[in-house]
From Swiss-Prot:
PANTHER family: HEAT SHOCK PROTEIN 90 FAMILY MEMBER. The keyword Lipid metabolism does not apply. One of its GO terms (molecular function) is ATP binding. Plants over-expressing HSP90.7 show albino and stunted leaves. Residues 742-780 are annotated as: Disordered. Transmembrane segments: none annotated. Belongs to the heat shock protein 90 family. This is Heat shock protein 90-5, chloroplastic. Molecular chaperone required for chloroplast biogenesis. Essential for chloroplast biogenesis and maintenance, and thus for embryogenesis. May be involved in the disassembly of VIPP1 for thylakoid membrane formation and/or maintenance. Cooperates with TIC components and other molecular chaperones to drive transport of preproteins into chloroplasts and functions in the chloroplast stroma to facilitate membrane translocation during protein import into the organelle. The lineage of its organism: Eukaryota, Viridiplantae, Streptophyta, Embryophyta, Tracheophyta. Expressed in roots, cotyledons, young leaves, mature leaves, stems, flowers, petals and siliques. Disruption phenotype: Embryonic lethality due to embryo development arrest at the heart stage. Residues 769-780 have a biased composition (Basic and acidic residues).
Length: 780
């Protein structure tokens, strides 16, 4: 065997301590990150020696070459890994945790585990409780000395347990205890033990430059003190001899804060807030040292007036006195741990207000427990009011879902892992005993488990919303829809897998119900026998929808049309495509079928106006893709519709409003506009005569241009040049009203006066019907 190689890892301050001839004990200061045991060989070739020097344990690593082994590939020597302990601790402390403040969560969790262990063991050994007092945790910050002291009345530790638990990196005493509990099903059936990785204690060095642990186990008569400083590979253990520091039972941890962290973490209010955030639902009372004020009654001497004799009179008054005392920080109990049948509605509302700092009662709640691959308890709430900021609708990081593991807060910073973005308005708590977390307990590890949880949470949320929609009190769902309807519409776009759950919850105004919202189920129930589709129209307002020319024939035939008046509505409906085998049809697009067409009449109309359609298309050129006879108009002369795959007027308006709108796409999509004409309208009949009898007429051409421009506006589009359109209208108005009510041109009037015509003041009134002569060229 090769000679042993030795390397001392204890820090330089130890060299100044005189070495006393005390026995040196061999202890394996192991790390779960290093291979040891049967993986290499039974004999230990890399041992950690704890040399006791003046009660200080210094870490030494003796790395030895293993015996030569012969394998199929040939002979070779097997080595074991070595580690720089101070560097390893630095990596554990500063690389695992993203926030310094989690040190308090970890230490409180350790204290809770110690109390749980004592409670379990006392079932069979009641003597362990002794006179150690109530099971509790106390946290006392000291801003003057820059320290935080955390005391629990739990199981404590013996000297051997101190070395084993605090001297062994990644050695979890809780994990060992849980393993023992599993062997005893009666004791281990129900526990609240939290720790599992064996590194949480070292998070104290996130904020502390020195940590002192004083502990007293009911199994031992002696109390021991463990001390260590940051960036050191050694620690000290001594027996406590000062009677003022003797504990009846439990553990006291004192953190000597770093200079940069004293002002933040030695402040009492900060500590209280951290406890409320991370450890509010720990199963044992947590008291924090807080400054309080009280009003006391005192006696004061009344001032003696001049000339008066005798002793001054006493008068009673009050003053405010400040003092320090213990305050319970976790008074709110974990409501989700109780049976839902035993909890009153008022308790749910009160818990909601305290947990989420709300002032309104929630609109609804659901309390459930799931079992199977993942077991967890949860309470979900629908708030009484929606977000005031529209950005919250599209922001998945709303911190509304709080994840707990064994009632210890883990995180509320989820980027859509637990809840989809469109359900981000839901608030609630999720608590599990067996979630796969990373070592820092800040991130969920296993995506499969997360997917299962997400699926169940979504299903329960939809069940809760469905109950509101089916409630006898219709105002509840009306309130829900006003506040959160936009979120569900977003779900139509983002979650195709849940369309069947989302679609029945949608509500819209319609041509038959402009005051109350209607559901798609009600729409289908009211459909006629020949109606095969769900018709909708997207506009910018309810007023615009009601006056749109697209509706004319549908209203005449008593066909209901849904009004989509919010920007997200049209995209949401387009993503749904169908509901209960009924297609969604936009009535502002080409090829509209109403289900009761008269094919003979339609064919005759197309034949009669086929020449006019070609003539108008020739006049308009590339402005429209084609011109055709309409089956959707009854009172308007024409309407401009979009191509089947093009943007509607509403969508075009929204895309133009985008800050980074794609102009090339806009030009491509708008090129499929189609002008539809009403064959029964007088203007169209006149133009039909004009195209046959006077196709070169400039007046007819001007009418076509103006007809197209007005169709742009009435159909919801935006004209390219409003000023040019205005001039055309003014010109046509001048033609229509010029001289009609007695006005004459100034030149005409002046020439008449010069000629002395005494009839110049008389004006002949001509009726419009008399203007058209029998030989009008536009007549057939």
């Amino acid at each position: 065997m090769a000679p042993a190689l030795s390397r001392s890892l204890y820090t330089s301050p130890l060299t100044s301590v005189p070495i006393t001839p005390v026995s040196s004990r061999l202890s394996h200061l192991r790390s779960s990150f290093l291979p040891h045991g049967g993986a290499l060989r039974t004999g230990v070739s890399c041992s950690w020696n704890l040399e006791k020097r003046c009660n200080r344990f210094a870490v030494k690593c003796d790395a030895a070459v293993a015996e030569k082994e012969t394998t199929e590939e040939g002979s070779g020597e097997k080595f074991e890994y070595q580690a720089e302990v101070s560097r390893l601790l630095d990596l554990i402390v500063h690389s695992l945790y993203s926030h310094k403040e989690v040190f308090l969560r970890e230490l409180v969790s350790n204290a809770s585990d110690a109390l749980d262990k004592l409670r379990f063991l006392s079932v069979t050994e009641p003597s362990l409780l002794g006179d150690g007092g109530d099971l509790e945790i106390r946290i006392k910050p000291d801003p003057d000395n820059g320290t935080i002291t955390i005391t629990d009345t739990g199981i404590g530790m013996t000297k051997e347990e101190l070395i084993d638990c605090l001297g062994t990196i990644a050695q979890s005493g809780t994990s060992k205890f849980l393993k023992a509990l599993k062997e005893n099903k009666d004791l281990g059936a129900d526990n609240g033990l939290i720790g599992q990785f064996g590194v949480g204690f070292y998070s104290a060095f996130l904020v502390a430059e020195k940590v002192v642990v004083s502990t007293k186990s009911p199994k031992s008569d002696k109390q021991y003190v463990w001390e260590s400083v940051a960036d050191s590979s050694s620690y000290l253990i001594r027996e406590e001899t000062d009677p003022d520091n003797i504990l009846r039972r439990g553990t006291q941890i004192t953190l000597y804060l770093r200079e940069d962290d004293k002002y933040e973490f030695a402040e009492s209010t900060r500590i209280k807030n951290l406890v409320k955030n991370y450890s509010q639902f720990v199963g044992f009372p947590i008291y924090t040292w807080q400054e309080k004020s009280r009003t006391i009654e005192v006696e004061e001497d009344e001032p003696v007036k001049e000339g008066e004799e005798g002793e001054p009179k006493k008068k009673k008054t009050t003053k405010t006195e400040k003092y320090w005392d213990w305050e319970l920080a976790n008074e709110t109990k974990p409501l989700w741990m109780r049976n839902s049948k035993e909890v009153e509605k008022g308790e749910y509302n009160e818990f909601y207000k305290k947990a989420f700092n709300e002032f309104l009662d929630p609109l609804a709640h659901t309390h459930f427990t799931t079992e199977g691959e993942v077991e967890f308890r949860s309470i979900l709430y629908i708030p009484g009011m929606g977000p005031l900021n529209n950005e919250d609708v599209t922001n998945p990081k709303t911190k509304n879902i709080r994840l707990y593991v064994k009632r210890v807060f883990i995180s509320d910073d989820f980027d859509g892992e637990l809840f989809p973005r469109y359900l981000s308005f839901v608030k609630g708590v999720v608590d599990s005993d067996d979630l796969p977390l990373n070592v820092s307990r800040e991130i969920l590890q296993e995506s499969r488990i997360v997917r299962i949880m997400r699926k169940r949470l979504i299903r329960k949320t939809f069940d809760m919303i469905q109950e509101i929609s089916e409630s006898e009190n219709k105002e509840d769902y009306k309130k829900f829809w006003e506040n959160f309807g936009r979120f569900l519409k977003l779900g139509c776009i983002e979650d195709t897998g849940n369309h069947k759950r989302i679609t029945p919850l949608l509500r819209f105004f319609s041509s038959k119900n402009e005051e109350e919202l209607t559901s798609l189920d009600d729409y289908i129930e009211n459909m006629g026998e020949n109606q095969k589709a769900i018709y909708y129209l997207a506009t910018d307002s309810l007023k615009s929808a009601k006056s749109a020319p697209f509706l004319e024939k549908l209203i005449q035939k008593d066909i209901e049309v849904l009004y989509l008046v919010e920007p997200i509505d049209e995209v949401a409906i387009q993503n749904l495509q169908t509901y209960k085998e009924k297609k969604f049809v936009d009535i502002s697009k080409e090829d509209l079928e109403l289900g009761d067409e008269d094919e003979v009449k339609d064919r005759e109309a197309k034949q009669e106006f086929n020449l006019l359609c070609d003539w108008i298309k020739q006049q308009l050129g590339d402005k429209v893709a084609k011109v055709q006879v309409s089956n959707r108009l009854s009172s308007s002369p024409c309407v401009l519709v979009s191509g089947k795959f093009g943007w509607s007027a509403n969508m075009e308006r929204l895309m133009k409003a985008q800050a980074l709108g794609d102009t090339s796409s806009l030009e491509f999509m708008r090129g499929r506009r189609i002008l539809e004409i009403n064959p029964d309208h007088p203007i169209i009949k006149d133009l039909n005569a004009a195209c046959k009898n006077a196709p070169e007429s400039t007046e007819a051409t001007r009418v076509v241009d103006l007809l197209y421009d007005t169709a742009i506006i009435s159909s919801g589009f935006t004209p390219d040049s409003p000023a040019e359109l205005g001039n055309k209208i003014y010109e046509m108005m001048a033609m229509a009203v010029g001289g009609r009510w007695g006005r004459v041109e100034e030149e005409e009037e002046s020439s008449t006066v010069n000629e002395g015509d005494d009839k110049s003041g008389e004006t002949e009134v001509v009726e419009p019907s008399e203007v058209r002569a029998e030989s009008d060229p536009w007549q057939d």
